[in-house]
Amino acid sequence: MVNKTLITAGDSIVVSVPAFSEYALNGLVEGAEIREVPANFETGQYDFSALVKAVDETTCLVWICNPNNPTGTYESVEDIRKLVAAIPKETLVIIDEAYIDFVTSVAVPTSRALLDEFPNVAIMRTFSKAYGLANYRVGYMMTPLELANYMQTIRLPYNLNTLSQVAAEAAFGDQEFVARTVSQNAEERAKWESLFDELGIHYYKSEANFIFFAAPDAEGLADAWLKSGYQVRRGQREGWLRLTIPMPQDGNVMRKILRDFMN
């Protein structure tokens, strides 16, 4: 809906790559030019100076996914603040915080404070990740009132059913579940990072519920896991895989398969 509201054919949008594919895909549908800025290959972090250079008078949107999908990397609020300050106020910066609940490295990871500092910032959240409601399709956006009112004029009626609303309210009220989920994810994520370090596998430091890593034979490893019933995401970069952090018992099995494969 954001794309339909803001993009006119001939506009450009700026995205870091690799990134969630829907940013570019939805922009193309609306006739936008997609300007892709490669992330730092060694760390997976955004190249903010290159993002700023990619923005010009045609740019209507800059997408920031934080933590980023598929790299899992987290960008500091201060770095995002500097980005917003460096681009024209006519360009909207959308910060997708779908995975923000999984961040454990900082006490307050959200960029919410930037809404009070800049008129061209919007933040998206979802109940699909840490709250476990992917099939209910519940999300929301924090944005300046003027933009919210403008988007309301094209919003489809009945876009959120009653069952989804009730489920979201119940999930939001169960913060103990969210805390438990985040804690277990961090614990299991650390086990994978430790094994990758041991095996000399290049990976990006993740603050999400997945890890993006390079494998000597990515397709072979993915096939080995698949034979045991475990599917990982392929195709987002040649030679790399995105592994969603599994439950503890499944993680033990998958790590054994990885060890055997590497040996």
What residue spans do the PLM features occupy?
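Phosphate-binding glycine-rich loop
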Residues: 1-12, 30
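Short glycine-rich anion-binding loops that position phosphate/pyrophosphate groups of nucleotides
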Residues: 20, 66-70, 100, 129, ...
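Short beta->alpha connector loops at strand-helix junctions that form conserved
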Residues: 17, 36-41, 236
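Active-site pre-lysine segment of PLP-dependent enzymes
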Residues: 28, 45-58, 70-93, 97-128
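PLP-dependent aminotransferase class I/II
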Residues: 120-197, 201-204
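Conserved PLP-binding catalytic core of the aspartate aminotransferase-like
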Residues: 186, 195-228, 245
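PLP-dependent enzyme catalytic core of the Aspartate aminotransferase-like
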Residues: 78, 219, 224-228, 233-263
